[in-house]
């Protein structure tokens, strides 16, 4: 079981191309905090990233920088410049017809691909929100990422049949590659960090068991046996890596799976309850109400109004 792939699938983490920025001369753009992650890929020239409380960061051609959901920031052509508001009318036009968004008065010297990643708001597994600080990856330090950026740039430069599908797939690949870089750069396990838990083999193996068989009646004891450690060791690793008990994670994962199925399918509640490990619909409904604040039927109705 590929734990990361399954978590990305269930969390609904999907990327899309926002706009292509072409800028020249003096330019600066202020971007409000949004409930989605942002990835800026510089395909030509140089861009400076401005994040409150951080030093301006130079991002060169072939580099990319990923920002966690809710990160207000600015991008500009210099380390010291005025950041102006986003021209919403021009942005909407660019999003609608696929044209570039032009900034500055001089001919374009810099080109930036602005990508966005959203996570299903009904899912609580914090994949994207684990990326707390801006992460800058240069073209020199990661050959795989460089090739992916080149592929994305080439696909956008010469659109053809299937370009939309290809671009979306490449954007999703970029997210996986950034997660890999994050795991390499942060070998320590930070409490409460879901991605950090991927560095802990005990927790990672336990998550793989839960993700592969959510219907199994998992307990701390059975998970410990499946990962060949004691219950005390398993609990200690979970608290250190995720800030919660094994049982709490199992329940959270089951509720995420159930939430998606309630919204996206017409499966009976009884069928869903068994699929996520509950012996009876009553037990499932009780657990679901505790987690989501309402019974499964009401939850499904609310999302389908």
For the regions a language model picked out, list residue spans one by one.
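An amphipathic alpha-helical interaction segment
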Residues: 111-125, 129-208
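Generic structural signal for alpha-helix termini and adjacent loop/cap motifs
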Residues: 45, 78, 155-158, 213, ...
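Glycine- and charge-enriched low-complexity intrinsically disordered segments
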Residues: 100-112
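Hydrophobic residues on short alpha-helical segments
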Residues: 39, 153, 207, 256-259
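Short helix-to-turn junction characteristic of helix-turn-helix DNA-binding domains
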Residues: 42, 210-213, 261-262
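Basic/polar phosphate-binding segments, predominantly the helix-turn-helix DNA-binding elements
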Residues: 177-183, 205-256, 273-302
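Generic protein-terminus/edge-of-domain signal
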Residues: 1-64, 71-103
